[in-house]
From Swiss-Prot:
Family statement drawn from the similarity comment of this UniProt entry: Belongs to the pyridoxamine 5'-phosphate oxidase family.
Entry coiled-coil feature ranges: none
Binding site for substrate: 7-10, 65, 122, 126, 130, 189-191
Keyword Oxidoreductase: yes
UniProt xrefs under Pfam families: PNP_phzG_C (PF10590), PNPOx_N (PF01243)
Binding site for FMN: 60-65, 75-76, 81-82, 139-140, 183, 193
Class of the enzyme per the UniProt entry, highest EC level: oxidoreductase
UniProt keywords, alphabetically: Flavoprotein, FMN, Oxidoreductase, Pyridoxine biosynthesis
Names of required cofactors: FMN
Organism of this sequence: Herminiimonas arsenicoxydans
Designated name of the protein: Pyridoxine/pyridoxamine 5'-phosphate oxidase
Length: 211
């Protein structure tokens, strides 16, 4: 079979303006809850896209750890590529793709670091081996081989044991949404797209987009 011949005709659900909430965070919470109940694999996995000083984008999958009216929060190494790019250009795009429900959510906005207290609280809630990995890994930096990486981990484990201080270069980011789009697959590629845009007065406008 040719790659060009691979296609699915989506028919599970529809999405109308009257079905959606007045604000996108409430609507996202509804869809996220439905993804959980549908047992979608890792519904908290999202693509995070950033842009470097050279104007070139980069993307990776990250796990969201919280969301509320303040924004969408994840944690990472501030010295990683995404961290360095966000320091220079504090805007990002998030993408959730729940293929089992034929749904997608795109979120764009400005990104800020969360407080040190919030980062500390989450870091200490992680499994100890995850905390050790965060200390041992200089994320995005080259390394000779797997053995060298495991040696770094073993050294950190011997040094800290279960007492794992949060590294100063590790913490959270929160994206404050300015644009959110909900996509529902439909038959014949006539998909439903409902977009929310944040206005200067803090209110959200909502409109349907052509597929």
């Amino acid at each position: 079979m040719s790659i060009a011949d691979i296609r699915t005709d989506y028919a599970q659900a529809d999405l109308s303006e009257t079905d959606t909430a007045a604000d996108p965070v409430t609507q996202f919470a509804k869809w996220f809850d439905e993804a959980l109940h549908a047992e979608v694999p890792e519904p908290n996995a999202m693509g995070v896209s950033t842009v470097g000083e050279n104007g070139r984008p980069s993307s990776r999958i990250v796990l969201i750890k919280d969301f509320d009216q303040r924004g969408f929060t994840w944690f990472t190494n501030y010295d990683s590529r995404k961290g360095r790019e966000l320091e220079k250009n504090p805007y990002a795009a998030l993408l959730f793709h729940w293929i089992a429900l034929e749904r997608e959510v795109r979120i764009e906005g400005r990104v800020e670091r969360v407080s040190a207290e919030e980062s500390e609280q989450y870091f200490q809630s992680r499994p100890v081996k995850s905390r050790l990995s965060a200390i041992a890994s200089a994320q995005s930096a080259p390394i000779a081989d797997r053995a060298a990486l495991e040696a770094q981990y073993a050294k950190v484990e011997a040094q800290h044991g279960d007492s794992t201080p949060r590294p100063p270069h590790w913490g959270g980011y929160r994206l404050q949404p300015e644009y959110v789009e909900f996509w529902q697959g439909r038959r014949s590629r006539l998909h439903d797209r409902i977009a929310y845009t944040l206005q200067k007065d803090g209110q959200w406008t909502r409109q349907r987009l052509q597929p």
